[in-house]
Amino acid sequence: MTDIVDELKWRGLFAQSTDEDALRKALADGPVTFYCGFDPTAASLHVGHLVQVLTMRRLQQAGLKPLALVGGATGQIGDPRPTAERTLNDPETIAAWVQRLRGQIEPFLTFEGPNAATMVNNLDWTAGMSAIEFLRDIGKHFRVNKMLTKDSVARRLESQEGISYTEFSYQLLQGMDFLELYRRHGCTLQQGGSDQWGNLTAGIDLIHRLEPGAVVHALATPLMTKADGTKFGKSESGAVWLDPEMTTPYAFYQFWLNVDDRDVSRYLRILSFKSREELAELEKLTEERPQARNAQRALAEELTTLVHGGEQCAAVIAASKALFGQGDLAELDEATLSAALSEVPHATVAELGPLVDLLVEVGLAPSKSGARRTVKEGGAYVNNVKVVDGEVAPDAGELLHGRWLVLRRGKKNLAAVEVGPVG
């Protein structure tokens, strides 16, 4: 079996650790309990969280025991962002988000067997602690000069807004999490992103002060980046969420399908569970025929299956093919079709007019004369059927599920018309 540290390094998942040799020894000596934390700062995890969630899954498959922490306490504070203070959410909202995040994380882990996963909430050990107890038992062991060196804190101190004592104290809470999990579960490894390094080591320092002789470790993964310099995890419409109500499975699939050729091989190593041989073959295909997007399809299919399930992934693939003329649109169920069409330009009309008007309405043609030219050149399609007369209105019987028409100009330009109340 491949050494898990070597595997993480090969996949680009190893940014740094506190003591690599000591970590390797701990992993070789026996089962290691580790944890990774997720703060409920929104109603859903987003694709940026997949690095940590899937790394937890990878570590569990290698024999480690995971503790998945959802921060009912830290979520009420918020890790300092480099730019501005977070908006505080009320405790009831955070409690609801804790449950939603638990439900998203649990399917990725195994809760049976010798290294069964455990879900934990840091509100369990902070809720009953008074401010005096926190300052005496935890705050006493932190040094402000060291806390000030954390990147996000330093940047905020240089800004006009500065940083509140609330957010400045966040690293004390995260440090206490590691201490409590060490005491309660024998947790000796914390996993997180490299931007969390200061918080990871804060917990180690606290344990060393209060538990002399304890051997504990931190492991940081690199931040996901994009070759074009834009922020990873954002589409044109905003963040890409794991919740299907916030980002449809179709949009989720398309996000990965549209990954830049310069990024796709790296993303596959980081996020996929395919073997080295399979990944090497996909890298080769990308070099030889990038236009086929084989690597992107493999990435999109695997991650959509992991997040939304195989049945939903199959429906999304069928919709993706059908929209571009490689399948029967009429075979798509209404929910899948509606979700897919929500991601393309569309217009709502009270009744169907001539096709040339519809092409202009949805933006597939700049004018009626442009629409007529598209039809004349054989480039206009309604529900994947080529149109020969643009002056005729589509028949109501052509409406998919009684409400949709899919219009296409050429091979790739899609739009939709929905018949219904306007306004």
Curated annotation (Swiss-Prot):
Its main location: cytoplasm. InterPro entries: aa-tRNA-synth_I_CS, aa-tRNA-synth_Ic, Rossmann-like_a/b/a_fold, S4_RNA-bd, S4_RNA-bd_sf, SYY-like_C, Tyr-tRNA-ligase, Tyr-tRNA-ligase_bac-type. It catalyses: tRNA(Tyr) + L-tyrosine + ATP = L-tyrosyl-tRNA(Tyr) + AMP + diphosphate + H(+). Residues 353-419 form the S4 RNA-binding domain. ATP binds at K234. Keywords: Aminoacyl-tRNA synthetase, ATP-binding, Cytoplasm, Ligase, Nucleotide-binding, Protein biosynthesis, RNA-binding. GO terms for biological process: tyrosyl-tRNA aminoacylation. Transmembrane segments: none annotated. GO terms for molecular function: ATP binding; RNA binding; tyrosine-tRNA ligase activity. HAMAP family: Tyr_tRNA_synth_type1 (MF_02006). Catalyzes the attachment of tyrosine to tRNA(Tyr) in a two-step reaction: tyrosine is first activated by ATP to form Tyr-AMP and then transferred to the acceptor end of tRNA(Tyr). Belongs to the class-I aminoacyl-tRNA synthetase family. TyrS type 1 subfamily. PANTHER family: TYROSINE--TRNA LIGASE, MITOCHONDRIAL (PTHR11766:SF0), TYROSYL-TRNA SYNTHETASE (PTHR11766). Homodimer. This is Tyrosine--tRNA ligase. It comes from Streptomyces griseus subsp. griseus (strain JCM 4626 / CBS 651.72 / NBRC 13350 / KCC S-0626 / ISP 5235). The lineage of its organism: Bacteria, Bacillati, Actinomycetota, Actinomycetes, Kitasatosporales.
